[in-house]
């Protein structure tokens, strides 16, 4: 700020007026001479003009912003529902000083609050200002380039200042800067990179930060399950953006060999999926996965055809031929498509990434087990109270949860996620048992805490820990954190812990510049200090793959108190020790984050869920149709009179009985929902005893046959068989063993002989049902490398129409990693 000089003499009016004009003119000249010219940069597609923006903090240097840079051609008209193409070139200098339009979306209908960050759902009116003018021409990115080395570029002398002549150690990057590409979150239905300002992170961490838009919802993830509309356009947009970055970031001073992709929530799920796709190979080297995973129940849509049909019904395009259906959908306006309210099963998504055999070749857990992501350095973690939004609606005025509401919440969770009408009782009671604090079971506040922990563990912690285990199993660099801090604001209850999305403002340095419209927090010095710590960890990881170096934790320039993180060394994660960093005001390295609950969800629950099937397996392979959980949502009444919008799965026709006594009618007054008639297990017990006795009898017979055969062999040397018998001896010699094998395997073979090989019941070991539990109750594995054809009848024989060929020549459909796998050797 320029200050006017003071004069000791009192000039005459004329002289004073002339002096003021002269000083004003000189001030304008000085401002113009000191103001940096607008930065320009060349790219492979043309020149860009950005803007140099100062930041409201003395420790942050200015940042060059290039906003609205096209990374792909507009996906409009016939290009709707197709992979992106490179952007066209332009002549002259393109102005890149304004945010681009956002992709079409609708936040005015019911949004899935449980999947969205708190700062998003609490500020929907503010969010609406960012998406006022959506446009299908939305594939743009924003680039934030630091112009000076941030405060983290030097290791300060003992006084931590530069004004006394102490010599500071220069630890800045001597060459090109690391690049951090942020994938915004949401629920695959909403969001934009324009909401996140990367300036502070870029300036403080001395890295280039990029945010981007990608197609969301119907336009980004609609799939017909075949070549007509294969889906995953939103993921392909992200891949195209990474391709643009790797080819052009050097013009901005960035290092294409040090690109880190990071995201939170659904953005983290996208990052996790990108590490598993061979299309991403070579486009980035590191990934930061914040509060999300490809293993979460909502990361992948296992029923794309179902929701596409629902959409086609609503807009009058439901025809049998999928090519005609997609052509019809292309004729509809984007507004008409995104305004259709199609609600998925709870804990799942209607439009999201699909297993197409190419972009996502197989189930994410299978790909992780095959090592498809081992070539990437990965840092991941969760927040302490991610499940806040699942519980907030059932908390009473005294900040507690009643026993009835607790029971209802668990039952609703089991009904919606597991869905089958039989075999749920044991599972439901076991979950309630595991999440009851038996030392304080009647305390409503304790019930609230354990209920939040239930949803946090199932939807975030277990998928993240399993992802970390699979990645670190072969020594790939892995770092795990648990975030335990949040800012003070009115966006959520006072009793809440660090909820979903609460780490985002600290990652982007919001506390350093003060509250914003999306983060209206009362930031303290502790918040500023913790934000500096987080940005140092994140940018260190982007620079070296190690969050501990090259820049040490040093924040005395912010806070007079000692930074406890200076004494903490963030250890690598491994499946045995499972070390993780507790990020909070009292940091420490701990081990085995919520290990008991993770083991419960990973190992015990899948078997409890299928106990009924194991003991009641019929002799036919015909499966009872699962319940449909995607009918229009309705308001369910709870015993205390509160309402909870949900979608209870309908009972399967094989089990439903409309006139059965005790059947629930939505028009009746709500009574105790969880009171059930005592169940008589005598029949099941009798059948079990009978089967056990039969197996015992068969084993006795088998043992007798074996003993008889052994005794017969002992006496054989004393006998000389006749030539006729001698010729048949080999057959007789093997018959008892074959009979024994038949007796031992008889029950299994008999139970499954009518079914195909893949449906054979194996009683020797419990099958792994964890993949099933991520799918909605009525999911059927639709697309895997071994089963998918992705070619409708009307398209058989057509040649490849696009460079993103889902089934190129030599497509590997085996269970082994692809020939182009990113598996680390």
From Swiss-Prot:
Which keywords does this chain's UniProt record carry? Cell adhesion, Cell membrane, Disulfide bond, Glycoprotein, Membrane, Phosphoprotein, Signal, Synapse, Transmembrane, Transmembrane helix
Residues modified as Phosphoserine are 722
List residues in topological domain: Extracellular: 35-686
Q: Name one GO molecular function term.
A: neurexin family protein binding
InterPro entries per the UniProt record, alphabetical: AB_hydrolase_fold (IPR029058), CarbesteraseB (IPR002018), Carboxylesterase_B_CS (IPR019819), Neuroligin/BSAL (IPR051093), Nlgn (IPR000460)
Describe what happens without this gene. Answer: No obvious phenotype, but mice present subtle behavorial changes with reduced ultrasound vocalization and impaired response to olfactory cues. In addition, mice have reduced brain volume. Mice lacking both NLGN1 and NLGN3, or NLGN2 and NLGN3, are viable, but have impaired breathing, drastically reduced reproduction rates and striking deficits in raising their offspring. Mice lacking NLGN1, NLGN2 and NLGN3 are born at the expected Mendelian rate, but die shortly after birth due to respiratory failure.
User: Record's PANTHER family?
Assistant: NEUROLIGIN
Q: What does this protein do?
A: Cell surface protein involved in cell-cell-interactions via its interactions with neurexin family members. Plays a role in synapse function and synaptic signal transmission, and probably mediates its effects by recruiting and clustering other synaptic proteins. May promote the initial formation of synapses, but is not essential for this. May also play a role in glia-glia or glia-neuron interactions in the developing peripheral nervous system.
- Name of the protein described by the UniProt record: Neuroligin-3
Q: What lineage is on file? A: Eukaryota, Metazoa, Chordata, Craniata, Vertebrata
Gene name, per UniProt, is Nlgn3
């Amino acid at each position: 700020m320029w200050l006017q000089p003071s004069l000791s003499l009192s000039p005459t009016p004329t002289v004073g007026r002339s002096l003021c004009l002269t000083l004003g003119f000189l001030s304008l000249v000085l401002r113009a001479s000191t103001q940096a010219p607008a930065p320009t940069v060349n790219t492979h597609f043309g020149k860009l003009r950005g803007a140099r923006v100062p930041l409201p903090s003395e420790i942050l240097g200015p940042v060059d912003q290039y906003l609205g840079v096209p990374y792909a051609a507009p996906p409009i008209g016939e290009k709707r529902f197709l992979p992106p193409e490179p952007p066209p070139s332009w002549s002259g200098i393109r102005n890149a000083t304004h945010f681009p339009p956002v992709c079409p979306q609708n936040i005015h209908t019911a949004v899935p609050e449980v999947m969205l960050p708190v700062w998003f759902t609490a500020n929907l009116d503010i969010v609406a200002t960012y998406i006022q003018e959506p446009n299908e021409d939305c594939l743009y990115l924003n680039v934030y380039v630091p112009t000076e080395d941030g405060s983290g570029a030097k290791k300060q002398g003992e006084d931590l200042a530069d004004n006394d002549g102490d010599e500071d150690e220069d630890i800045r990057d001597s060459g090109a800067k690391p690049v951090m590409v942020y994938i915004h979150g949401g629920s695959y239905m909403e969001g934009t990179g324009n909401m996140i300002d990367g300036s502070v992170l870029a300036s403080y961490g001395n890295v280039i930060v990029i945010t981007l838009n990608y197609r969301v919802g119907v336009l980004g993830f609609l799939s017909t399950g075949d070549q007509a509309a294969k889906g995953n356009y939103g993921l392909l947009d992200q891949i195209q953006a990474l391709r643009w970055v790797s080819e052009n970031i050097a013009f901005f001073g960035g290092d294409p060999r040090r690109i880190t992709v990071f995201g939170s929530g659904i953005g983290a799920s996208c990052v996790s999926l990108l590490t598993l796709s061979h299309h991403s190979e070579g486009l980035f080297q590191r990934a930061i996965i914040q509060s999300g995973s490809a293993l979460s129940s909502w990361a992948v849509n296992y029923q794309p055809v179902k929701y596409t049909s629902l959409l086609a019904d609503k807009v009058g395009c439901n025809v049998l031929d999928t090519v005609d259906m997609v052509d019809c959908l292309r004729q509809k306006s984007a507004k008409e498509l995104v305004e259709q309210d199609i609600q998925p099963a709870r804990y799942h998504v209607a439009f999201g990434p699909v297993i197409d055999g190419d972009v996502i070749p197989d189930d994410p857990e299978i790909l992780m087990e095959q090592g498809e992501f081992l070539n990437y350095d990965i840092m991941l973690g969760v927040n302490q109270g991610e499940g806040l939004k699942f519980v907030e609606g059932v908390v009473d005025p005294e900040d507690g949860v009643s026993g009835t509401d607790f029971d209802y919440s668990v039952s609703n969770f089991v009904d919606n996620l597991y869905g089958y009408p039989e075999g749920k009782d044991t599972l439901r009671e076991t979950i309630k048992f595991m999440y009851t604090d038996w030392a304080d079971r009647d305390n409503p506040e304790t019930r609230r805490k354990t209920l939040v922990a239930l949803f946090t563990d199932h939807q975030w912690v277990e998928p993240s820990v399993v992802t970390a285990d699979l990645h670190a199993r072969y020594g790939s660099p892995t770092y795990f954190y648990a975030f335990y801090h949040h800012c003070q604001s009115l966006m959520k209850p006072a009793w809440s812990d660090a909820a979903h999305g609460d780490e985002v403002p600290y990652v982007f340095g919001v506390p350093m510049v003060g509250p914003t419209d999306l983060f209206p927090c009362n930031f303290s010095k502790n918040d500023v200090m913790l934000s500096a710590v987080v940005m140092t960890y994140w940018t260190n990881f982007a620079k070296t793959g190690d969050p501990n170096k090259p820049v040490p934790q040093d924040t005395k320039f912010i806070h007079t108190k000692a930074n406890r993180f200076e004494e903490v060394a963030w250890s690598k994660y491994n499946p045995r020790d499972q070390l993780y960093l507790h990020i909070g005001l009292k940091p420490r390295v701990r081990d085995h984050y919520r290990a008991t609950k993770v083991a419960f969800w990973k190992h015990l629950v899948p078997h409890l869920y299928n106990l009924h099937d194991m003991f009641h397996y019929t002799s036919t392979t015909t499966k009872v149709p699962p319940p449909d959980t995607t009918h229009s949502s309705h308001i369910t009444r709870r015993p205390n009179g509160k309402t909870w919008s949900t979608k209870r799965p309908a009972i399967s026709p094989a089990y439903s009985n409309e006139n059965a006594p005790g059947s629930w009618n939505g028009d009746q007054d709500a009574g105790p929902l969880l009171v059930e008639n005592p169940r008589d297990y005598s029949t099941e017990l009798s059948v079990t005893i009978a089967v056990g006795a039969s197996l015992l009898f068969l084993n006795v017979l088998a043992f007798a046959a074996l003993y008889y055969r052994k005794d017969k062999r002992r006496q054989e040397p004393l006998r000389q068989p006749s030539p006729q018998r001698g010729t048949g001896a080999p057959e007789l010699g093997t018959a008892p063993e074959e009979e024994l094998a038949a007796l031992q395997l008889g029950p299994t073979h008999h139970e499954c002989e009518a079914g195909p090989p893949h449906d054979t019941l194996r009683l020797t070991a419990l099958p792994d049902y964890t993949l099933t539990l991520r799918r909605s109750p009525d999911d059927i594995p639709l697309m895997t490398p071994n089963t998918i054809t992705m070619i409708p009848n009307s398209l058989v024989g057509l040649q490849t129409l696009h460079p993103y060929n889902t089934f190129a020549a030599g497509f590997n459909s085996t269970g082994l990693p692809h020939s182009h796998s990113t598996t680390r050797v």
